[in-house]
Swiss-Prot record:
Family: Belongs to the thiolase-like superfamily. Chalcone/stilbene synthases family.
Organism taxonomic ancestry: Eukaryota, Viridiplantae, Streptophyta, Embryophyta, Tracheophyta
Topological relation to the membrane, as annotated: Multi-pass membrane protein
Protein name as it appears in the record: 3-ketoacyl-CoA synthase 15
Subcellular location: Membrane
Transmembrane regions: 40-60, 63-83
Length: 451
């Protein structure tokens, strides 16, 4: 794995298929369907516009021959425009930073956990030990409601936290992009554990009064890698609806993942998950290339769910008292290695190499292992480590806090490629590659790293 992974990072992984022969088995039927949709749309356009344009060309050639050449050039450019599929552009993104009164230090965490009366001495000591080794600093954010005596997970607390982080991220994004919500055609929202009725995506539509024909999707139960899945779904929808905007929102709700029992197998996630959310605005409008920050280059999804060990490595469980919590098996690191190896093999040849890497900031141990396995430099890991330290594990939105860090440090230059990697239950490893379309200046407003 190390040899293959290092090749990919430093110069790309060469395709293993025979030279010159397409790997038809690698194609998914959804792309065939999208191809048919694109072909039908293109045929309809040519049927409407080609005949009158040909008549115009014949008329000009006969009576105004001096204009024949520029008109021919125009026709060629027009045909090229319609025959070339539009790319998916990332206009901007925003990461929510909760208010300062929700900051929590490690000592505050332990003190509040003790005062809650929900944990015995063994549970307290375990959480203290995990916190000390977590890589999380003294300024991450947590809802205080989870430390209430006798606290049990409930929808009211979950909805309140969801509204805070989701609306906060979207408000900042809309202010930065200046896009009217009525122009948003597609909405994709992912949240792992909290799944409400009406859905969180419906909550967004109601709050912002989006159009009645908005293509809305709510992804749940897909873990920390669901942010990349949401981007993939939005990409396919943008290809089907050319010239549209897509809003993608990624979050996890801490007050709904919190475990208030004493089962030692369910306690560690308490020490890692922190509040956060990211909102991303995508576009398939060609004209938006000139104001977009990034262009989507490649996206690969890997699912190891066919293997029982992978499938059961992360799951939501209940203890004997009926309290739910997240279980993470001891095999998860090895499962993650195999998933990452498969993802890298599928990613194929990428040249030039990546200038920047954003690895899901789940824990210090995970980052250390990826650092070692892929033979990365400290600079490669800087964004992930700083994000874990400052914001903790914000789940699927973590990779966006990392990209925000790179922008804050003015590291994203025109032509740079950034590789975002997410891991999640199932077990899944998903990654996406973006290319910077311009030098990204440090944002003055919608960046969580601004003081």
């Amino acid at each position: 794995m190390e040899k293959e992974a290092t090749k990919m990072v430093n110069g790309g992984v060469k395709s293993k298929s025979p030279k010159g022969s397409p790997d038809f088995l690698g194609y998914n039927l959804r792309y065939v369907k999208l191809g048919y949709i694109y072909l039908l749309s293109l045929s309809r356009t040519f049927c409407f516009f080609l005949p009158p344009l040909l008549l115009l060309f014949i008329f000009v050639s006969r009576f105004l021959p001096i204009l024949a050449f520029p008109l021919s050039t125009f026709f060629i450019l027009l045909i090229y425009h319609y025959l070339t599929p539009s790319s998916v552009f990332l206009l901007d993104f925003s990461c929510y930073r909760p208010p300062d009164h929700l900051k929590i230090t490690k000592s505050d965490f332990i003190e509040l956990a003790m005062k809650s009366g929900n944990f015995n001495e063994t549970a307290i000591e375990l959480q203290r030990k995990v916190l000390d080794q977590s890589g999380i600093g003294e300024e991450s954010y947590m809802p205080r409601v989870v430390f209430k005596p006798g606290h049990r997970v409930n929808l009211r607390d979950g909805r309140e936290e969801a509204a805070m982080v989701i609306f906060g991220a979207i408000d900042e994004l809309l202010a930065a992009t200046k896009i009217n919500v009525k122009h948003i055609k597609i909405l994709v929202l992912n949240c792992g554990v909290l799944n409400t009725t009406p859905s969180l995506s419906a909550m967004v539509i109601n709050h912002y009064k989006l159009r009645h024909n908005t293509e809305s999707y709510n992804l749940g139960g897909m873990g920390c890698s669901a942010g990349v899945i949401a981007i993939d779904l939005a990409k396919d929808l943008l290809n089907a609806h050319q010239g549209s905007y897509a809003l993608v929102v990624s979050t996890e709700i801490v007050s709904f993942t919190w475990y208030s029992g004493n089962d030692v197998a369910l306690l560690p996630p308490n020490c890692f998950f922190r509040m956060g959310a990211a909102a991303v605005m995508l576009s398939s409008r060609r004209i938006d290339r000139w104001r977009a920050k990034y262009q989507l280059m490649q996206l690969v999804r890997t699912h190891k769910g066919m293997e029982d060990t992978s499938y059961k490595s992360i799951e939501l469980r209940e203890d004997r008292d009926g309290k739910q919590g997240l279980y993470v098996s001891r095999d998860v690191m090895e499962v993650g290695r195999h998933a990452l190896k498969a993802n890298i093999a599928t990613l194929g040849r990428l040249e030039p190499s990546f200038e920047h890497i954003c690895v899901l900031a789940s824990s210090k141990k995970v980052l250390d292992d990826i650092h070692k396995d892929l033979k990365l430099t400290e600079e490669n890991m800087e964004a992930s480590r700083r994000t874990l330290e400052r914001f903790g594990n914000t789940s699927s939105s973590s990779i966006w806090y990392e990209l925000a860090y790179l922008e804050h440090k003015a590291k994203m230059k025109r032509g740079d490629r950034v590789w975002q990697i997410g891991f999640g239950s199932g077990f899944k490893c998903n990654s996406v590659v973006w290319k910077a379309l311009k030098n990204i200046d440090p944002p003055r407003h919608n960046n969580p790293w601004n003081l």
